[in-house]
Regions:
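SAM-dependent nucleic-acid methyltransferase catalytic core
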Residues: 2-105, 111-117
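A generic secondary-structure signal
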Residues: 6, 190-191
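Short glycine-centered segments of the SAM/dcSAM-binding site in methyltransferase folds
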Residues: 18, 199-200
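SAM-dependent methyltransferase catalytic-core segment centered on the flexible catalytic loop
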Residues: 110-190
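Acceptor-substrate binding/catalytic loop of class I
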Residues: 173-182, 204-215
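Helix-to-beta-strand junctions that scaffold the AdoMet/dcAdoMet cofactor pocket
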Residues: 194-197
Length: 215
């Protein structure tokens, strides 16, 4: 608590964000975190009484040193005329012009594997995000369960054949799956729009099952 309160008092917004990133990264981990929980990163948290939480200050210092090393390497890229610039946006409506991207490397969210907001909330609540705000954000995630799809792009036949199958078992899950496919289609359409002709898009996708069905 002392650490996060101290970070919140830092006036320099850039420094504060780096420290918030550091703090978040030592909470949401698979196993080597500073709490008694396991598998926070995969959204399946459970307490393990035999686990000894790691020292918060030591872990923060270790992570911060890693980040400072990464940031120092930006000078190498700058000297070569190459700089990374993070841009916040929505994959379904990219804030980019047509034909401006040379390479896309991404791993889309899974249809039924990880509850991303459930994983994120353990650090976001510490960083003073309210549960109401988290709920609003969750509703905007790709494939979110709260909002039904209205319209959306026409799906490939293979996707349409997959969707009715879960309906007999769970109509709610079928609607969630339709929304997921619809929004992934929007994302892929945006990738096609911004990618230059002849350039590559690499999508890493693993197996996902819903009610025992491969989707």
């Amino acid at each position: 608590m002392t650490l996060v309160l101290t970070i919140g008092k830092i006036a320099d917004s850039g420094l504060r964000r780096i420290l918030e990133l550091t703090f978040s990264s030592i909470i949401v981990t698979k196993s080597a975190g500073v709490s008694g929980a396991m598998d926070l990163a995969h959204g399946r948290p459970h307490r393990v009484n035999s686990k000894t939480p790691r020292n918060t200050i030591q872990q923060s210092e270790r992570k911060l040193r890693q980040y400072l090393l990464y940031f120092s390497k930006q000078d190498v890229g700058k000297a070569a005329g190459v700089m990374a610039q993070p841009v916040m946006g929505d994959a379904r409506a990219l804030p980019l012009n047509n034909d401006v991207v040379d390479l896309i490397v991404t791993s889309p969210p899974y249809a039924n594997a990880i509850d991303y907001m459930r994983a994120h909330k353990y650090s976001l609540v510490w960083l003073e995000c309210s549960t109401a705000e988290l709920s609003r954000k969750r509703a905007t995630y790709i494939g979110a369960e709260r909002i039904a799809v209205q319209g959306g792009p026409i799906l490939p036949e293979s996707s349409e054949r997959t969707i009715p199958a879960p309906t007999e078992l769970d109509s709610t899950r079928a609607r969630i799956l339709r929304r997921y496919f619809s929004e992934i289609a929007q994302s892929i359409s945006e990738m096609f729009r911004v990618l230059r002709s002849g350039r590559a898009a690499v999508l890493v996708v693993g197996t996902s099952t819903m009610r025992g069905l491969d989707v």
